[in-house]
UniProtKB/Swiss-Prot annotation:
SUPFAM superfamilies: WD40 repeat-like. Its main location: nucleus. This is Ribosome biogenesis protein wdr12. Belongs to the WD repeat WDR12/YTM1 family. Keywords: Nucleus, Repeat, Ribosome biogenesis, rRNA processing, WD repeat. Component of the PeBoW complex, which is required for maturation of 28S and 5.8S ribosomal RNAs and formation of the 60S ribosome. One of its GO terms (biological process) is maturation of 5.8S rRNA from tricistronic rRNA transcript (SSU-rRNA, 5.8S rRNA, LSU-rRNA).
Length: 422
């Protein structure tokens, strides 16, 4: 097979070529096809400037020659081969390196502020330029996770979860730059490793080393909940903790080992991952289990994309796996992304791109994936000098990662803002 018939198509109207079959060499690779498209565009518009393109055949990126790809994917050449082309994704550009005093366990950012949690028992708020704005101190042990509850003008509400078995709810006024502990959420009997705020921003869920999930109110009030602790003098309790005591609205039990990651799929449905090799879906209204996805190894992290309705998981066997959480077959993995050489400790879907996600690992590397190219990542972000422990991805195209080198790196990734529909 020396030549084959191909038709090129794209969703980007700026780069449309004639919708007719072309005869092209079967041995063509990405650079050859990119040259063909650019020549066709030049013929239509003399002022066309060269653009690097990527190509998809049957929804998979071309990473070899066309004939090899067609053979591997078992595609017939009897008919015209349909080839989609998209503008090549440029590499994320490094922006800031923000030094911390200890390991960075967690990060959550928006368009204005970055919130990090650290093994030095504090959380910190940073500007996008890497300026330290506020240190949030009050825990007696390592901060394991952080989350923004809401950002309302000058007043923000945030959460910190800790190895000290508590979650603290804070109010921060950015104009006065004052932070106040409003509530100390108590009820877990082990390290609180993961927290997630619901879509209404009125509740949050926590997951713990004690195998339990708990749902709490995320609304600051002036009320203190009573807590049953017969062996603890009340006076001592008052002086030890910051903020009013808050107890959970509901406890969800079912996991047999530590809960490592939790998220809300919508206002009524929770998803949790555990060291017991399962991912479980829960009814957040009743607290009942809805379904279980079973794996063969410990799950460290999960992320859900409402755009593609897929769940991504990271495990101790170095694989990132994609699941359909609605599937009746609870062990069906849709796709495995295999490139890391250590435990996968962080996964995060792109907020504005249904095919892209990042993963971080104990191998010190952050990888940017496109699910249409599952055999290799789009890019390796290899700035860290030690274990990667957390990652985030903001609506405005910032990728962040933190780790055991005490550094938070930020990268600007324009492709997922401008090319959200690719």
């Amino acid at each position: 097979m020396s030549q084959l018939q191909a038709r090129f198509f794209t969703e980007n109207k700026k780069y449309l070529v004639d919708d007719v079959p072309f005869s092209i060499p079967a041995s063509s690779e990405v650079a050859d096809l990119s040259g063909v498209i650019n020549k066709l565009l030049e013929a239509k518009n003399a002022g066309h400037k060269h653009v690097e393109f990527d190509f998809l055949v049957r929804g998979q990126f071309l990473r070899t020659s066309l004939d090899k790809h067609i053979e591997t994917e078992n595609i017939s050449t009897e008919e015209v081969v349909e080839i989609e082309y998209v503008e090549k994704f440029t590499a994320p550009q490094p922006e800031e390196c923000i030094m911390h005093d200890d390991w960075i366990s967690s990060v959550e950012a928006d368009s204005e502020w970055i919130l990090t949690g650290s093994y030095d028992k504090t959380a910190r708020i940073w500007s996008m330029e890497g300026k330290a704005v506020m240190t949030v101190a009050g825990h007696a042990d390592v901060v394991k996770d952080v989350a923004w509850v809401k950002r309302d003008g000058l007043n923000s509400v945030l959460l910190t979860a800790s190895l000290d078995q508590t979650v603290m709810l804070w109010e921060w006024n950015s104009e006065r730059n004052k932070v106040k502990a409003r509530h100390c959420c108590r009820g877990h009997a082990g390290s609180v490793d993961t927290i997630a705020v619901d879509p209404t921003r009125t509740k949050f869920c926590s997951g713990s080393w004690d195998k339990m999930l708990k749902i709490w109110s995320a609304v600051p009030t002036e009320e203190e909940d009573e807590i049953e602790e017969p062996n603890r003098p009340r006076k001592k309790q008052k002086t030890e903790q910051m903020g009013l005591t808050r107890t959970p609205l509901m406890t969800l039990s079912g996991h047999n080992e530590a809960v490592s990651s939790v998220l809300w799929m919508d206002a009524d449905e929770l998803c949790s991952a555990s060291w017991d090799h399962t991912i479980r879906l829960w009814d957040a209204e009743t607290g009942g289990q809805k379904s279980t996805l079973s794996g063969s190894k410990v799950f460290n992290c999960i992320s859900y994309s409402p755009l593609c309705r897929r769940l991504a998981s990271g495990s101790t066997d170095r694989h990132v796996r994609l699941w359909d959480p609605r599937s009746k077959d609870g062990s069906l993995v849709l796709l495995s992304l295999t490139s890391h050489n250590g435990w996968v400790t962080a996964v995060r879907w792109a907020p504005s791109h249904e095919h892209q996600l990042v993963s971080g690992s104990l191998d010190n590397v952050v990888k940017l994936w496109d699910t249409r190219s599952c055999k290799a990542p789009l890019y390796d972000l290899a700035a860290h000098e030690d274990k990667v422990l957390c990652a985030d991805w903001t609506e405005n195209g910032l990728i962040l990662s933190g780790g055991a080198d005490n550094k938070l790196y930020t990268y600007r990734y324009a492709a997922c803002v401008s090319d959200a529909g690719a």
